[in-house]
């Protein structure tokens, strides 16, 4: 009976050994499968943790940086060029290549003219055209050369031709009558011209300036010519250097008469010009700059 028992035991041992091998094989397969599943699950989790850390580091860096009050940041360009009217007036806003004009068809004058002059633009070589023509975009009656003939007044540029040398089109448009006002010859050729030259110097020094200028008209104004072009009593000009720190702004006021005094004689606060014109210039500027 002993051999029979030994044979049976041997068979059992073999089966157990095979089962153990099969179990180990399955265990290894299950282990590999589990590892793969774990890796697949961990990849997006780890990536999410990475993104969170990056975001946290960025926020930490920003919190350690000097804080800038964005509400005090001053917009540039045409946002600053357009004054805010504080009283109703007849106007048509016309945007030309080199300047923007608020044209008043009743007065046959601009209410105001504004433009930005950059350092690069002062280097222009375009020649002066001297051809005064009607603004094709202006609606209503507009002045003509005949209105100024023997009137005793110059056709005074608001946006100067010398500031438009950077473009043939800008130069041509600077001679539109919508950009002209009747000016005393010794204002146009002296004080007003001297200020235009000084502003070009500022544009070069400060990289750019924004200029707004125009006439000041009383209710009962003298007129010239068949088209009854109003003759201003005064002229204003406000200038802003928006890219210097601190920003600078200055105002000038001229009577429409001979102007031969030094330029500083005509300096006034921008606030005082705003009261005269019923307009708000550089509306986003702090009051201390305008004063």
Enumerate the language-model features and the residues they cover:
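Domain-level detector for secreted/extracellular nuclease and nuclease-toxin modules, and
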Residues: 14-291
């Amino acid at each position: 009976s002993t051999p029979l028992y030994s044979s049976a035991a041997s068979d059992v041992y073999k089966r157990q050994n095979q089962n153990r091998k099969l179990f180990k094989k399955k265990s290894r397969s299950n282990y590999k499968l589990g590892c793969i599943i774990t890796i697949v699950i961990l990849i997006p989790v780890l990536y999410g943790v990475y993104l969170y850390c990056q975001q946290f580091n960025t926020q930490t860096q920003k919190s350690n940086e000097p804080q800038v009050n964005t509400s005090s940041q001053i917009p540039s360009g045409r946002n600053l060029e357009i004054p805010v009217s504080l009283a109703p007036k007849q106007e048509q806003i016309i945007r030309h290549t080199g300047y923007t004009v608020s044209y008043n068809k009743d007065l046959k004058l601009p209410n105001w003219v504004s433009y930005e002059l950059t350092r690069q633009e002062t280097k222009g070589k375009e020649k002066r055209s001297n051809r005064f023509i009607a603004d094709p975009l202006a609606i209503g009656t507009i002045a003509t050369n005949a209105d100024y003939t023997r009137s005793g007044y110059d056709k005074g540029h608001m946006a100067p031709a010398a500031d438009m040398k950077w473009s043939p089109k800008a130069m041509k448009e600077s001679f539109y009558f919508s950009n002209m006002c009747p000016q005393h010859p010794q204002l146009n050729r002296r004080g007003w011209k001297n200020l235009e030259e000084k502003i070009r110097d500022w544009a070069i020094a400060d990289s750019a300036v924004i200029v707004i200028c125009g006439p000041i008209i009383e209710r009962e104004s003298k007129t010239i010519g068949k088209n009854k072009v109003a003759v201003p009593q005064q002229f204003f000009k406000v200038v802003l250097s928006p890219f210097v720190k601190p920003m600078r702004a200055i105002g000038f006021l001229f009577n429409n008469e001979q102007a031969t005094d030094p330029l500083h004689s005509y300096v006034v606060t921008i606030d005082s010009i705003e009261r005269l014109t019923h307009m708000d210039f550089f509306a986003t500027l702090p009051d201390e700059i305008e004063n």
